[in-house]
Amino acid sequence: MKMNLHCFANLIPIMILALFSNSGLINATEVGKRTDALEASAWNESKWISAVDAPVVKGHNNGRAADGASWFVSTVKNEQKIVSAKWMTAGLGVYELYVNGKPVGGEFLKPGFTHYAKTKRSFTYDITDIIRTKPNAENMLSVQVTPGWWGDKIITPGGYDGMIGKKCAFRGVLELTFSDGSKRRYGTDLKNWKAGIAGPVKHAGIFDGEEYDAREPMGYECVDKLSTPEENTEFSGDILPSDGAEVYLRTDLALAPVKAYVWKNVEGAKENEFGKVIIAREFASGTEMTVSPGETLVVDFGQNCASVPSFVFKAAEGTVLTCLPAELLNDGNGAKIRGMDGPEGSCHRENLRIPHTGIR
């Protein structure tokens, strides 16, 4: 089975995220504008909610976050014509917002790292330009939350029973201003929201990487699979307005690959050396890359960087593409005495905290 890739690597210099591909920059489309938070008392009109079926990590072997992504969906019907809409949000876990199926905000890995018990950061958006404003029109709010910053290893010490954060959760308040000047708020609750484990993200964690099944619909496309949420009482600290995320999309900083090649066999292997990869094919930037079973594609950006890869590929149903980012390539004929973990020209992974996980 062959797999054709329009291969791309997406880069994130520290604190800055850039997405790119071999065929050019990947344009992320988001809506909504960051705005000032509502007054703190507005949180009283909402609850932290979680999916009843969300798995919980148990036991002292807690190296991997719980599988699945929690989705939260609610539909709001306009009582009158809307002239303004603001959505104040917070999450226990990394969360992504959608209004009528469109992603809201340009931040990545919201809400960022804070003390797990004391503080969570909120993000408020003016979504007036993207909602349906006519009387009786309906708008769908949806959120995906995964365990990062909450229910994963990054905040959980070794030997701990399970993870510090048990279930992902979401909390939000939508404020609508009507044409007659009146306002109404809609907070997360157990009556008007649906929740469940759904969507294409099958696993995600700060150290774990992400497993993504593109055959699966987004959570807002399968609301019939969701059910009544439960209240989450794990966090009792303060929710404070954010002054900006730690990671933003910066297409102006995107890097192009300096080299890309496929290898399969090895030459020059010795007792204390892994040898050197035999390059089967090299690819110019912007060209289609074909990878056959047993082959490994190496996309080299020529420098170490924090990155988020993006892939456009074509293959038969059931094909699994595994992406294993690395900080460096093995060299020196794969000399074991130098700490190499494979043949020269292959990706070196043993220096990473979790070397055998990545994106699938």
Each language-model region and where it sits:
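Bacterial N-terminal signal peptides
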Residues: 10-22
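Extracellular/oxidizing-compartment recognition motifs
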Residues: 29-360
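Bacterial Sec-dependent signal peptides at the C-terminal "C-region" and cleavage site
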Residues: 19-33
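N-terminal secretory signal peptides that target proteins for export/translocation
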Residues: 1-8
